[in-house]
């Protein structure tokens, strides 16, 4: 038997997942690592700990499955996106901790960049992104400006930059390969996703030497070889690389224009494949590269909901209405509807398509008969409403009709939520049997490159449906409920002065 290993380097843990040809999961190994918070709003990881945890679980998953390294035909990598590492090209030592995507330390740099006439528009038109602390560009600038000697060393060509995928490729190949894929490059705010090259104008504005940047390659193809077991060990091709959300889109076999996926985690991440069209959003969504294959790219629109599953944690930990998040389905089904109650979980403001940082959460429409079941049900419904908000914006921006929604992530296991999602969208919602779609995407990309799977058609056929939820709600009722949601959202806006 031959296998593929997907390395899934996430924000809180590193995982390795072993797949066979039929996409069965043969083994999983996982190790959490340290979150570092040096100041308020700052988040860092130790790059050496990212590497040791990731290489550790790789060895562990092979040993536990009782197979030989020679049975592994390829490695795929998927990773937390935007997180930024700068290291010395000769010693391989990081000059600073990894600055994580969540870190807000460069917000001030972003404010200054926004003052430059036309710069924000230029970034949006060419990288598809917003000028924001979330993306890698300003994080690199911060390291060069604040770490002693970093700028001089970078200008001499001694330092390299990479997102987490690039760092892992560098370490796996013993410093031979400095490369990334199209999807990860598209999250740096430095990559021109129309011309498919590093953008000189942005590099100049941020004062980042081009010599630091990795080579950008197809998401599926040989990046280099991982030497497991040192000299004379088995060399395994690193053959697939994609950022986590794009990898999940691929793992859901969303290969056609209009196909979309939602990952229901703490927040929700929605991506819609827009094919070969670069679609500029007028609704606060970002445009990104969905995947790069054979020197060509497909684009996607991306929108995120800040509070998805986190609202269920709030019911459990703060309101103490439930003891386990799985109980929400039982309570939601005890009432026939939410009795006009709406929960708007704008705890940290509202994300796409509203972008109101000053909105705050609210429970609206309460009457004397409203009870805990209505509030629990309305909280689950809020996740579906917010998903609809983003998908509606995607349809408006792209002019592409939504072609069903594929779902994954923790809350996708909640049947009540999935039924309501289908009802409120008026579209089918498809849940796969393999919910590890992020890792599966990386495995697919690697497998295609080495001929483990022949082509995308074979993958599409192997994608197995667990359950399809179809809409049963009359249009009139759907429109009325959604209008109530929009009214509730209006009430929460600009609450904080």
UniProtKB/Swiss-Prot annotation:
Molecular-function GO terms, alphabetical: ATP binding; glycerol kinase activity
Binding site for ATP: 11-13, 266, 309, 313, 410
Enzyme class: transferase
GO biological process: glycerol catabolic process; glycerol metabolic process; glycerol-3-phosphate metabolic process
Keyword flag ATP-binding: yes
UniProt-annotated binding residues for glycerol: 81-82, 134, 244-245
Catalytic activity: glycerol + ATP = sn-glycerol 3-phosphate + ADP + H(+)
CDD domains xref list: FGGY_EcGK_like
Source organism, top-level taxon: Bacteria
GO cellular component, one term: cytosol
Residues at which sn-glycerol 3-phosphate binds: 11, 81-82, 134, 244
Pfam families in the record: FGGY_C, FGGY_N
EC number: 2.7.1.30
PANTHER family (UniProt xref): GLYCEROL KINASE, SUGAR KINASE
UniProt function note: Key enzyme in the regulation of glycerol uptake and metabolism. Catalyzes the phosphorylation of glycerol to yield sn-glycerol 3-phosphate.
Protein's recorded name: Glycerol kinase
Native organism taxonomy: Bacteria, Fusobacteriati, Fusobacteriota, Fusobacteriia, Fusobacteriales
């Amino acid at each position: 038997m031959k296998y593929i290993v997907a390395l899934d380097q996430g924000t809180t843990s590193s995982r390795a997942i072993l797949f066979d040809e039929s996409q069965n999961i043969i083994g999983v190994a996982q190790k959490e690592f340290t979150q570092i918070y040096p100041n308020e709003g700052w988040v860092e990881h130790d790059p050496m700990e990212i590497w040791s945890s990731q290489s550790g679980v790789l060895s562990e998953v092979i040993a536990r499955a009782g197979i030989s390294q020679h049975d592994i035909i390829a490695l795929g990598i998927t990773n937390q996106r935007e997180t930024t590492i700068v290291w010395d090209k000769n010693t391989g030592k990081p000059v600073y901790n990894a600055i994580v995507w969540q870190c807000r330390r460069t917000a001030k740099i972003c404010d200054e960049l926004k003052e430059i006439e036309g710069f924000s528009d230029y970034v949006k038109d060419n990288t598809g992104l917003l000028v924001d602390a979330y993306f890698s560009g300003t994080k690199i600038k911060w390291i060069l400006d604040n770490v002693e000697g970093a700028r001089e060393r970078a200008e001499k060509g001694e330092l390299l930059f990479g997102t987490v995928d690039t760092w892992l490729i560098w370490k796996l190949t013993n410093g031979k390969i400095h490369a990334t894929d199209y999807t990860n490059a598209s999250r740096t705010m430095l990559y021109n996703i129309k011309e498919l090259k590093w953008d000189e104008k942005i590099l100049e504005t941020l004062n980042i030497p081009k010599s630091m940047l990795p080579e950008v390659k197809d998401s599926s193809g040989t990046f280099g070889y991982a030497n497991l077991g040192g000299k004379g060990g088995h060399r395994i091709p690193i053959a697939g690389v994609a950022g986590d959300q794009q990898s999940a889109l691929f793992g859901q076999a969303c290969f056609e224009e209009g196909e979309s996926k939602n990952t229901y985690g703490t927040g929700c991440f929605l991506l819609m494949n827009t094919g070969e069209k670069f679609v500029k959003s007028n609704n606060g969504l970002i445009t990104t590269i969905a995947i790069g294959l054979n020197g060509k790219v497909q684009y996607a629109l991306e929108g995120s909901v800040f509070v998805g599953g986190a609202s269920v944690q709030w019911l459990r930990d703060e309101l103490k209405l439930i003891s386990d998040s799985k109980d929400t389905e039982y309570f939601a089904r005890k009432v026939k509807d939410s009795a006009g109650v709406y929960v708007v979980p704008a705890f940290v403001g509202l994300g796409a398509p509203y972008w109101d940082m000053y909105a705050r959460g609210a429970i609206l429409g309460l009457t004397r008969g409203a009870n805990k079941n209505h509030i629990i049900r309305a909280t689950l419904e809020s996740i579906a409403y917010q998903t609809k908000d983003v998908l509606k914006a995607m349809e408006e921006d792209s002019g592409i009709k939504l072609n069903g929604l594929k779902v994954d992530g923790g809350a996708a296991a909640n049947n009540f939520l999935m039924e309501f999602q289908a009802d409120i969208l008026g579209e089918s919602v498809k849940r796969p049997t393999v919910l590890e779609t992020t890792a599966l995407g990386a495995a697919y990309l690697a497998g295609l490159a080495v001929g483990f799977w022949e082509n995308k058609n074979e993958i599409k056929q192997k994608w197995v449906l667990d359950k399809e939820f179809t809409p049963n709600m009359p249009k009139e009722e759907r429109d009325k409920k959604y209008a109530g949601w929009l009214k509730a959202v209006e009430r929460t806006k600009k609450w904080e002065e």
